Amino acid sequence: ITESTVNEIHKVLRSCFRQAVKWDMMEKNPAVDATVPKAKKQEREIWTAEMLMQALEACDNKMLKIAFHLAFTATLRIGEVLGLTWDAMDISEEAIAANRAYVYINKEVERVSKQAVEELNSKDIILIFPSQKKNNKTVRVLKSPKTDSSKRKVFTPKSVAQCLIELKKDQEEIIEALGNEYQNYNLVMATTFGLPIGDSYLRTKMQDIIDELGLPDVVFHSLRHTSVTYKLKLSGGDIKAVQGDSGHAQADMVTEVYGHILDEDRRKNAELMENAFYNKENLNPQMKNQ
């Protein structure tokens, strides 16, 4: 059993015993003073921006390509990508020309158990999508984000805004052709008949590209990590701006969890120090004779 598993079990027990103390079923929470091993944080492997560009160039799947662009430029979770709707953005010609095109993240698609939906009494659930199979114990729902900080406006590069415009035109042609057969939920990431694209579909198509190009075997969520890392580099470490895009409640989450320092940058730092400090020609006269 791993340290992380022990820690997860301890969290559950501590929560259960805490509730038992509140209900006067026991006097003290025995899990509070328990000694648990420190779980070693394993840094997730991520794609570099160059690797993502390779994947985009090799990708011939329209929906996956859009998902790549959104996850990277808007720092979205996969549920947020799938829950994006056309009314939650401004990709007008005026907005694009003024560099103020944006997407607004205020919904996400998630698969939950039918029992959970009943127990929640549809709290935070905007709509329940029809099941494809009769005996499914789970349903996909469009729901509000878990935290208020997850609701955010993210400005979009012109190229991505143009991709969205092209996708919207394609979708409108499908809607016109299918008529009432199209179930219009106003989703950006929609199937031919209007239902939300499945996260497993995106993961499968992404895995195909990984296998084809021999890229590091990462999960879709890692694109969010790539996004944060790249934005930190571009902005010169503007943590608050990047936090605004990522929707993290605390800024330290950006630096602690996503602040990947790439080997390429570390090598560049060594080169910069060599040229700026150890190159005798660059030293001031007093230091040259030391």
Model-found features: residue ranges?
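C-terminal catalytic core of tyrosine-transesterase DNA break-rejoin enzymes
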Residues: 4, 22, 69, 73, ...
